[in-house]
């Protein structure tokens, strides 16, 4: 099971997460308490292994700005968490992840229209897009066709206590965590290590 740690804002946490087995590190460039500058993201990316996905999270940003930041920082993927459509997705010259809020089964059907490399299924949008620590009904994803499952990233309120059930129910390509590995709003290295270990064990 691949694991993405999102909302990283410092070199030490990023390096430790990779040492613990993280497959992807997420940098939030949209409005959020975890927002990061391109300069700091570039510094962190320069310190983590080449094979790890470096994902930039954007919300309703222009293609031009996304591409500029991606090139400046060395991002390998961009995650689109707003109302982006296929016209915008196809203009990107970098692999993409389209986030979709799931409340009903029809949300999954609608997600199939996106011409993207990966689909990230998350809890429905609130004030901030993603990172709100709330789960949704994983059963809605339990019967996906394999071709969709193979490009699915599961997010939304995941933590050490519920990832076993989440992985067993959805069997996604990757799981994504942010607030579930934080203590008082800050990334907790102990929680990151435990989360990654548990996720890898669950998928054996």
Swiss-Prot record:
Keyword tags: Amino-acid biosynthesis, Aromatic amino acid biosynthesis, Isomerase, Tryptophan biosynthesis
InterPro entries in alphabetical order: Aldolase_TIM, PRAI_dom, RibuloseP-bd_barrel, TrpF_fam
GO molecular function terms listed in the Swiss-Prot or TrEMBL record: phosphoribosylanthranilate isomerase activity
Enzyme Commission number: 5.3.1.24
Catalytic activity reported: N-(5-phospho-beta-D-ribosyl)anthranilate = 1-(2-carboxyphenylamino)-1-deoxy-D-ribulose 5-phosphate
Any Pfam family the entry gives: PRAI
Domain of life: Bacteria
Top EC category: isomerase
GO biological process terms, semicolon-separated: L-tryptophan biosynthetic process
Pathway(s) this gene product operates in, as recorded in its UniProt entry: Amino-acid biosynthesis; L-tryptophan biosynthesis; L-tryptophan from chorismate: step 3/5
PANTHER family from the UniProt entry: N-(5'-PHOSPHORIBOSYL)ANTHRANILATE ISOMERASE (PTHR42894:SF1)
Family named by the database record: Belongs to the TrpF family.
Name of the protein this chain belongs to: N-(5'-phosphoribosyl)anthranilate isomerase
Organism, scientific name: Bacillus mycoides (strain KBAB4) (Bacillus weihenstephanensis)
Lineage, highest ranks first: Bacteria, Bacillati, Bacillota, Bacilli, Bacillales
Gene name for this UniProt entry: trpF
């Amino acid at each position: 099971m691949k694991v993405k740690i999102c909302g990283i804002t410092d070199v030490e946490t990023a390096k430790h997460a990779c040492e613990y087995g993280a497959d992807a590190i997420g940098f939030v460039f949209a409005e959020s308490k975890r927002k990061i500058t391109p300069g700091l993201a570039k510094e962190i990316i320069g310190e983590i292994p080449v094979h790890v996905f470096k994902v930039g999270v954007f919300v309703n940003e222009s293609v031009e700005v996304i591409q500029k930041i991606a090139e400046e920082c060395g991002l390998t993927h961009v995650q689109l968490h707003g109302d982006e459509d296929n016209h915008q997705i196809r203009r990107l010259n970098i692999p993409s992840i389209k986030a979709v809020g799931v409340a009903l089964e029809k949300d999954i059907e609608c997600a199939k229209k996106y011409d993207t490399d990966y689909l990230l299924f998350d809890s429905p949008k609130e004030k901030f897009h993603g990172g709100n620590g709330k789960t949704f009904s994983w059963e809605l994803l339990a019967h996906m066709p394999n071709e969709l499952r193979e490009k699915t990233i599961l997010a939304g309120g995941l933590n050490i206590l519920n990832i076993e059930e989440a992985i067993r129910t959805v069997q996604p390509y990757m799981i994504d965590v942010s607030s579930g590995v934080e203590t008082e709003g800050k990334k907790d290295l102990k929680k990151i290590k435990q989360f990654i270990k548990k996720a890898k064990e669950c998928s054996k």
